[in-house]
């Protein structure tokens, strides 16, 4: 059973694994609510989070303030002889709605080629003072021998190498892509192609391959869609059915969900047919029927009387309703308009394949299997599952945490946290268990994971117990238990490993983690960097001397993350 549980907990899907150390500055006063901290990535001895009064006031553009700081601190960041202007590209500049600071998002480059996983965020206050730089910079690239050579492999050959390693011929959802990066692992730094293979059959996959641009060897790979034990997807694909939106009148229907509860549904009436298409929110919500095949998105769910009480309707009822709840949570709590904050439609497909024990975000929409009736019931019946998966989409459009090792475990934990908070928002039998409503219907009290007690299902609740192997993308669904426990303690309080945490409630938990995920976390955020970002987020929201700041720090003390 334990082995089975270990396999199944990777259901809810979409880095640098290292330890860190930090010390606080006392020499110069930081701006209001900015903590003076300097935290280094211990493995590569490069800063991963620095905050305080990092520069004086300035009338320059925010990005010029950042570049001036990086040039002044070239030795600290080990940039060699290159200027900051040649070492980084500005990818986004946004206003922080809380602090009214300007947030500059950077991508490290070398010879104008992006460095995989090396992104940074800098916060420049209204008076032009630089107050935060978050994100590890890959150091000493000018000293890496392989970066002095020429690539011998082209993009096409890199894709072929990835396809050969995959070992089977998939049916692609989109054409394979390949982009050249500077890539680092524990032993080497080289040019590599990052190849993306996205497909649904013979089983869903969204693989990232790293192919050495000099030797053509596969250096690493990971899949952001995880399969679980049970029947595989039906490989007999039908031609893609029409899935066009309809025009018509907004109406209200009703239906019974997977657990038998009745829900009100926002639908569209067009030509005497009702559709599960909700036009009333900032993002249109569509629910489709795969009809037990594997083509996406399927056909827009249609009904003759706007009453969805048939057994087959249940999965669609919950997918449609819970997508709306998740949208409302993020809109009402954070004024976020869909996962991309630009009104992107929310698409869900139910009845995917036959007896399929999985749910996943494929990069553009949600997909739900029906389960086999023993391990799972239809997976759209779990509100925390839907909140979890749509939060992966949000993370992809903000911090874009790499789905490996500590950054991947943080990615998973954020989805667990907000899946739970969405459940509390809707007040539909909320708890701190993940997947309890749809997992093992014949076993009461069972779940995929527990945030209150990760060890209940074999997950670590302290950094000293973390998984250090390479399975499950470096333990993304296992080590998430460490962050989950910290989040649970932050919301509810408690004593863990002799450390007492004062709880601040779920609402403040959500505000702090949302702010950190959107404005402080970078692609390769470690647990230690996450702690620093969350503490600073709490200081921004509640003040540097607040109980919230103290509790965030204590919650990480309790799980052994410094």
From Swiss-Prot:
Name it: Bacillolysin
List the catalytic activities from the record.
Answer: Similar, but not identical, to that of thermolysin
Q: Which GO terms describe its cellular component?
A: extracellular region
What GO annotations for molecular function exist for this entry? metal ion binding; metalloendopeptidase activity
**Sequence positions that bind Ca(2+) 3:** 423, 429, 431, 436
Its annotated function is as follows: Extracellular zinc metalloprotease.
Cofactor detail note: Binds 4 Ca(2+) ions per subunit. Binds 1 zinc ion per subunit.
């Amino acid at each position: 059973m334990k082995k089975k549980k270990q396999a199944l907990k990777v259901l809810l899907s979409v880095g640098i694994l290292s330890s860190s150390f930090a010390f606080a500055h006392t020499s110069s006063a930081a701006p209001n609510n900015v903590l003076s901290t300097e935290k280094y990535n211990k493995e590569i001895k490069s800063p991963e989070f620095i905050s305080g009064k990092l520069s004086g006031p300035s009338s320059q553009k925010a990005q010029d303030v950042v570049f001036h700081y990086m040039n002044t601190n070239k030795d600290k960041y080990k940039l060699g002889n290159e200027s900051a202007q040649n070492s980084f590209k500005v990818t986004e500049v946004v206003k922080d709605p809380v602090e009214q600071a300007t947030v500059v998002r950077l991508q490290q480059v070398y010879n104008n080629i992006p460095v995989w996983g090396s992104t940074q965020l800098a916060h420049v206050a209204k008076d032009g003072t630089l107050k935060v730089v978050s994100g590890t910079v890959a150091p000493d690239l000018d000293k890496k021998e392989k970066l002095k050579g020429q690539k011998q492999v082209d993009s096409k050959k890199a894709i072929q190498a990835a396809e050969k390693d995959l070992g089977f011929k998939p049916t692609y959802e989109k054409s394979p892509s390949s982009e050249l990066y500077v890539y680092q692992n524990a032993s080497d730094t080289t040019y590599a192609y990052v190849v993306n293979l996205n497909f649904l059959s013979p089983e869903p996959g969204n693989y990232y391959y790293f192919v050495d641009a000099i030797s053509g060897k596969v250096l690493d790979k990971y899949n952001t869609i995880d399969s679980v034990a049970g029947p595989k997807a039906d490989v007999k694909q039908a031609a893609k059915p029409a899935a066009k939106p309809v025009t018509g009148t907004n109406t209200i229907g009703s239906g019974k969900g997977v657990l038998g509860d009745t829900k009100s549904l926002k639908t569209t009436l067009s030509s005497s047919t009702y559709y599960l298409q909700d036009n009333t929110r900032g993002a249109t919500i569509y629910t489709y029927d795969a009809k037990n095949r594997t083509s996406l998105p399927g056909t827009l769910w249609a009904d003759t009387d706007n009453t969805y009480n048939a057994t087959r309707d249940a999965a669609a009822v919950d997918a449609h309703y819970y997508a709306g709840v998740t949208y409302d949570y993020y809109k009402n709590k954070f004024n976020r308009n869909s996962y991309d904050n630009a009104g992107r439609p929310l698409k869900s497909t139910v009845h995917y394949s036959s007896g399929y024990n999985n749910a996943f975000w494929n990069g553009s929409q949600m997909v739900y299997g029906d389960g086999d009736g023993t391990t799972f019931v239809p997976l759209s019946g779990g509100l925390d599952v839907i909140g979890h998966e749509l939060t992966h989409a949000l993370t992809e459009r903000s911090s874009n945490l790499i789905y490996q090792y500590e950054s991947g475990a943080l990615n998973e934990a954020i989805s667990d946290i907000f899946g739970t908070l969405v459940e509390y928002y809707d007040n539909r039998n909320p708890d701190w268990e993940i997947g309890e409503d749809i997992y093992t219907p014949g076993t009461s009290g069972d779940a995929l994971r527990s945030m209150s007690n990760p060890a209940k299902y074999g997950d670590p609740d302290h950094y000293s117990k973390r998984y250090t192997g390479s399975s499950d993308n470096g333990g993304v669904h296992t080590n998430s238990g460490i962050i989950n426990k910290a989040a649970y303690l932050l919301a509810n309080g408690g004593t863990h490993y002799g450390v007492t945490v004062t709880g601040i409630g779920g609402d403040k938990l959500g505000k702090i983690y949302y702010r950190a995920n959107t404005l402080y976390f970078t692609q390769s955020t470690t647990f230690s960097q996450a702690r620093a970002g969350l503490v600073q987020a709490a200081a921004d929201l509640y003040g540097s001397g607040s109980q919230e700041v103290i509790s965030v720090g204590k919650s990480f003390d309790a799980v052994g993350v410094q």
